[in-house]
């Protein structure tokens, strides 16, 4: 299995490298300020105009002042849901499971080994509108290990301050996740759920890694 994953990544990496430089979403490990290849060439920040390879899957990732694309390297099935590993050519990695961040690397603030306990399915969340569960994670830098948090996930009205593109926000079910006992519920998250083949699917997500370090993502191009 590992050999197959390695071969796939080596095959994808030149394509990713040609697509963009350091992701620069909330920082890059080797430069304080990073631009994509397209910005460096003067084409600007509009990655939405890039011609996509139909054989690859893309993730549109953004912050308030920067947008970039990541490419799916591989997906590993598990009982809790497939873990998708997304890459940028600058070395940033984002792992998602059921639309939630379970690991990151190469950002200013990284989460590692994210584990949930008592996590409901998205269908259960949609039916009940609210849920509580726990999360354990490690955080870098500062070597914070085994951070334990109690989370509350609840339905919210359709927001008007998202970075969602190509999909009507009002057509989705919106939920906000907050940390109990923390100031303003940080680090918070937000999810938009739609139905694909009658199954609830995360169409759009936001995650704050710290009070001022937030990213959003959606599969690209928008197809819901």
What function would you assign to each model-found segment?
Residues 29-103, 113, 129-224:
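Acidic, serine/threonine-rich low-complexity disordered tracts
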Residues 24-27:
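C-terminal motif of bacterial Sec signal peptides marking the signal peptidase cleavage site
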Residues 111-118:
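Surface-exposed, glycine/proline- and aromatic-rich loop segments on solvent-exposed faces
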Residues 15-18, 49:
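Homeobox/homeodomain signature
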Residues 2-16:
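Bacterial N-terminal signal peptides that target proteins for export
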């Amino acid at each position: 299995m590992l050999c197959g994953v390695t071969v796939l990544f080596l095959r994808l990496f030149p394509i990713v490298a040609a697509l963009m430089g350091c992701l620069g979403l909330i920082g890059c490990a080797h430069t304080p300020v990073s631009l994509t290849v397209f910005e460096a060439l003067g084409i600007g920040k509009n990655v939405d105009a890039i011609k996509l390879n139909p054989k690859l899957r893309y993730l549109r990732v953004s912050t308030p002042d920067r947008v970039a694309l990541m490419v799916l390297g591989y997906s590993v099935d598990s009982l809790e849901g497939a873990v998708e590993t997304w890459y940028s050519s600058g070395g940033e990695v984002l792992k998602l499971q059921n639309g939630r961040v379970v690991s990151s690397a190469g950002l200013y603030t990284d989460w590692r080994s994210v584990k949930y306990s008592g996590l409901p399915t998205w269908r259960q969340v949609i039916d009940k509108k609210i849920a509580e569960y726990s999360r354990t994670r490690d955080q870098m830098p500062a070597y914070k290990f085994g951070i334990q948090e109690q989370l509350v996930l609840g339905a919210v009205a359709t927001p008007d301050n998202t970075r969602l593109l190509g999909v009507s926000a009002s057509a989705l079910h919106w939920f906000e996740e907050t940390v109990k006992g923390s100031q303003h519920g940080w680090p918070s998250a937000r999810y938009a759920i739609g139905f694909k083949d009658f199954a609830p699917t995360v169409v759009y997500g936001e995650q704050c890694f710290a009070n001022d370090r937030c990213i959003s993502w959606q599969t690209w191009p928008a197809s819901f």
